[in-house]
Amino acid sequence: MRIVQVGLSELSLLQEISKNTFEETFAAFNTKEDMTHYFEHNLSLDQLALELQSPTSSFYFIYVEEELSGYMKLNISETFEIERIYILNKFQGIGVGKTLMNFAFDQSKSLGFNSLWLGVWEHNTRAISFYKSLGFISYGEHDFLLGSDLQRDILYRKSF
């Protein structure tokens, strides 16, 4: 497996993997209208370009045998957040997510953080089990608006 930082020249590829993984993960639980709204507002080329150019955000692709298998977005300011981590379904269960998480752990430690956090949809039981297996502990919640659907994310923190 190979992890590479995403550059602005890979914006279209970032949008493609973002949409594909989000759709695989959440389309069965949300309306087409809400998914379309999310894609148009949160995963547009303009929005992703803004995020890519932000000094507090960075994106990473992960490849399995030269095939793009997922991505991660990190936000680094006063805290270290894993804002997005998505793996294509066909690559789940082979250690891709764990490899990305270990990369995030190493990044946060190298920058002097003693913890990191993330939010996960309360009904994403597979992801919740995965995060708990890595030592994440629930510490709160926040709202997440997907189109017109107000959803609840559980906040998890891992301390080192």
List where the protein language model places each region.
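Short coil/turn segments at alpha/beta junctions that flank glycine-rich nucleotide-binding fingerprints
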Residues: 94, 111-114
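Active-site acidic-Proline motif in GNAT/NAT acetyltransferases
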Residues: 88-94, 98, 122-123
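Conserved phosphate-binding and hydrolysis motifs of nucleotide-dependent enzymes
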Residues: 66, 70, 95-97, 135
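C-terminal "cap" of GNAT-fold acetyltransferases
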Residues: 80, 114-128, 132-134, 141-160
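Extreme N-terminal starter segment of soluble prokaryotic enzymes
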Residues: 1-3
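Acetyl-CoA-dependent GNAT
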Residues: 5-11, 15-90, 101-103, 107, ...
